[in-house]
A protein has these predicted regions:
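Extracytoplasmic surface signature
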Residues: 1-299
């Protein structure tokens, strides 16, 4: 075995470990993002030291210099950063934190990509179990889509109940009509992940109570926030990766009857047969024909 401490790199073509990249995080790494030029790797998570040096929940590495830790980039998030994205000179961050560099920031913040200084971009999440799990910037750099378990952003719960579009320059909440349909937040539900392309944004969700959260599955909306399609296959859905023609999701789906797919089946043990992932067509031609089983939300 080759020791690694919460982060590693491997070659895509072979799967072989990259021996020269071995920073040590003293807590979990949760998100990665590259600078526009591909020279700087940003790593977020629940750590306060990297290679024995103080770096609080966000660090940067110089890939043009063998992945060396960039000591000068040292923003101080008071606790976990769960998701990040980088555009130009700005690193956007979401998580469970309450302050950045000593300044109040409730779950959402932006810092300078070189210095780590706190930027004026300020949006505040609130509610029971308020956290941000997914954050991505639109390809044109004008909007930020965020998802999580928060019940409001800047005091707004529609949009803002687990999902919202924000202005990338001002952090002002933008019209997100899909949030009138997709409602996942609170103690028993969340939007777990978001992804983007030129045509819109994608999200995934889980629900333990349809009174607080109504989708287990994935969805796509356009950049005006209008719903394009959704697949309510029953089972927590964790991440999403879109291409032009397909969408890949990781989950534990057990019934896709809602869109004419497989029904619940049981293993010889009697337990439900959960899938670990699905591939879907990236198309609005999805017909939701039945509610499915076990009292799930009826789309």
């Amino acid at each position: 075995e080759t020791p690694r401490s919460n982060i590693l790199a491997y070659t895509l073509s072979t799967g072989e470990l990259v021996e020269g990249f071995a920073p040590a995080l003293n807590g979990p790494g949760r998100a990665l993002a590259l600078s526009d030029d591909g020279r700087t790797l940003y790593v977020a998570g629940g750590f306060n030291q990297v290679d024995g040096k103080w770096h609080n929940n966000l660090a940067a590495f110089d890939l043009s210099n063998g992945g060396a830790l960039i000591d000068s980039f040292k923003p101080v998030f008071n606790t976990t950063v769960s998701t990040i994205d980088v555009v130009g000179s700005t690193v956007y961050a979401g998580g469970y934190f309450k302050s950045v560099n000593g300044q109040p920031r409730l779950g959402l913040a932006a810092v300078d990509a070189s210095t780590g200084a706190t930027l004026d971009w300020t949006a505040s999440i609130s509610g029971i179990n308020a956290q941000v799990y997914g954050l991505r910037v639109s390809p044109d750099g004008t909007k930020v889509v965020v998802g999580g378990s928060f019940q409001a952003i800047n005091g707004s719960s529609n949009p803002g109940y687990g999902l919202a579009l924000l202005d990338a320059n001002t952090a002002q909440i933008l019209p997100t009509p899909v949030n009138s349909q997709i409602r996942n937040a609170g103690r028993y539900g969340a939007i777990y992940d978001v992804a983007v392309d030129d045509n819109g944004f994608y999200g995934t969700g889980y629900s333990m109570s349809i009174s607080e959260a109504n989708i287990e599955g994935a969805f796509k909306a356009d950049w005006n926030g209008q719903l394009i399609w959704l697949e309510p296959c029953h089972g927590d859905t964790y991440s999403v990766y879109p291409t032009a023609s397909e969408v890949y999701v990781t989950n534990h789906a057990h019934s896709c009857q809602t869109i004419g797919g497989f029904a619940d089946t049981r293993l010889p043990s009697g337990h439900l047969d959960y899938k670990a992932g699905l591939a879907l067509t990236n198309s609005p031609d999805v017909t939701i024909g039945t509610q499915g089983t076990d009292g799930y939300y009826d789309w």
